[in-house]
């Protein structure tokens, strides 16, 4: 079967014995059923392939993001503090983030105006090439040139990683809605936050195994972890040649839409409250989550008494694994209490633990196990709440035709928050001590709770009804959407 094939079948409205009421499991394209036309429906294996590729892709993206921790340790050991100053460490960390911001914005638009599949093929190819270039960084001399080369290629990789988010999130939520509507929230969390979070401890285990196998040979370890990181997007690239766009996107998109400045203004005018609140919530969460994740290696390394690189890596594995149960609880809570309240619970835990760790840091840092457990619980609450729900809310809050763009704007603000937070946390830590960063995280989490209160409860939204509402709104304002047969 060709990559773009789909199953065509006539499904009369009155002859479907298994049809469920709206809002349940089965997606029904109303206008097609009423007219007795042939339905566009991706085959089950194509839908499953799309979701599978989203699982692997988000794992790959999490693997890419978590590479910052071992990279910082390796470069600091190889080059020393003078050869790898804090400002260069910040540049390398921010390169992936800034690239991600540009990629998110560009691919959010492209995936809505062309297709999810085209955007995903491009991003997978770009991440593969850029990661391979990163693996060759230690061959560049002198070290100053090598660091700048690494900044550039990580920025390119970041463009691909960031560009992955809008089409992947949109395609995943649409296929989940096709498959099991009432479970689309937990399914979405499982292939986004759970995969990205699980990638961190697995990446650290790979790093630790490479250290052991090479007898602490850091250049060999560096090449090994980046080579493995190259394989993942290459596999995804192959899988995505066989995927196709979802039913929702097939019937509701802007491919043939006449787009003037007024057209975009109409979209902003209708959806600006959702756009503003999701973007602000994303900004606040990433402002504290990314710096805390990236800086964990430096904090733990400074607390290990003999500065042994393997001991540091073992503690990092434990710390990286602790948030995973939080994601599982968050996935369950998205349906149990709703997306919004799940986010509030997570931010509340972040507030409490942030201030506890900050207030007891001087004594806590003398007991590594206690520190790692509390630090891990802090991260677990973050991943349970906003980590599990902000991407889900941002994806569900916009109709299909502009889902990529809406999600991309919110995510771009999130990545901007991550870049700003990374830029702020390192100088703050150097000026006021490590405890100050936890106080800041707790304070920002309070703001996050306030913003979350105003977010829509996106689990109650019917994606098809939102699509029809957008079509009617545009028609009333002189823009009739041309629907594909």
Segments from the language model and where they lie:
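Transmembrane-helix signature of 12-pass secondary carriers
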Residues: 2-485
């Amino acid at each position: 079967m060709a990559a773009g094939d789909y199953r065509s079948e006539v499904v009369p409205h009155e002859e479907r014995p298994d049809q469920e009421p709206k809002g349940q499991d089965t997606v029904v394209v109303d206008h097609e059923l009423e007219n007795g036309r042939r339905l566009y429906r991706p085959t089950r294996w194509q839908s499953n392939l799309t979701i599978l590729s989203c699982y692997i892709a988000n794992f790959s993206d999490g693997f890419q993001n978590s590479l910052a921790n071992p990279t910082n340790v390796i470069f600091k050991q190889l080059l020393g503090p003078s050869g790898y100053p804090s400002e260069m460490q910040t540049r390398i960390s921010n390169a992936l983030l800034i690239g991600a911001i540009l990629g998110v914005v560009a691919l959010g638009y492209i995936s809505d105006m062309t297709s999810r599949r085209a955007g995903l093929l491009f991003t997978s190819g770009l991440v593969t090439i850029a990661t391979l270039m990163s693996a060759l960084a230690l061959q560049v001399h002198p070290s100053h040139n090598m660091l700048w080369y690494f900044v550039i290629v990580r920025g390119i990789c970041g463009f691909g990683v960031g560009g992955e988010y809008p089409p992947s999130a949109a395609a995943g939520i649409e296929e989940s809605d096709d498959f099991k509507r009432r479970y689309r929230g937990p399914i979405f969390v499982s292939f986004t936050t759970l995969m990205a979070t699980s990638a961190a401890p697995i990446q650290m285990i790979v790093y630790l195994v490479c250290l052991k196998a090479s007898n602490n040979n850091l250049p060999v370890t560096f090449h090994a972890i980046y080579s493995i990181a190259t394989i993942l997007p290459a596999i995804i690239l192959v899988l995505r040649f066989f995927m196709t766009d979802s039913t929702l996107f097939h019937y509701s998109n802007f491919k043939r839409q006449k787009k003037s400045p007024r057209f975009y203004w109409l979209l902003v005018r209708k959806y600006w409250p959702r756009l503003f609140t999701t973007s602000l919530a994303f900004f606040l969460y990433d402002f504290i989550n990314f710096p805390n994740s990236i800086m964990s290696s430096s904090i733990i390394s400074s607390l290990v008494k003999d500065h042994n690189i393997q001991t540091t890596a073992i503690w990092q594995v434990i710390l990286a694994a602790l948030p995973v149960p939080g994601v599982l609880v968050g996935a369950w809570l998205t349906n149990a209490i709703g997306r919004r309240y799940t986010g509030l619970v997570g931010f509340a835990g972040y507030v409490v633990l942030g201030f506890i760790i900050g207030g007891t840091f001087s004594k806590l840092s003398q007991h590594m196990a206690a520190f790692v457990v509390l630090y891990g619980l802090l991260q677990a609450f973050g991943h349970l709440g906003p980590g599990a729900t902000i991407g889900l809310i941002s994806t569900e809050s916009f109709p299909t035709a502009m889902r990529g763009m809406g999600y991309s704007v919110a995510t771009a603000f999130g990545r901007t928050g991550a870049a700003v937070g990374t830029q702020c946390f390192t100088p703050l830590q150097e000026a006021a001590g490590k405890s100050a960063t936890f106080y800041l995280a707790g304070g920002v989490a309070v703001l996050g709770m306030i913003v979350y209160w105003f977010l829509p409860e996106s689990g109650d939204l019917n994606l098809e009804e939102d699509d029809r509402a957008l079509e009617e709104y545009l028609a009333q304002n002189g823009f009739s959407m041309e629907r594909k047969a």
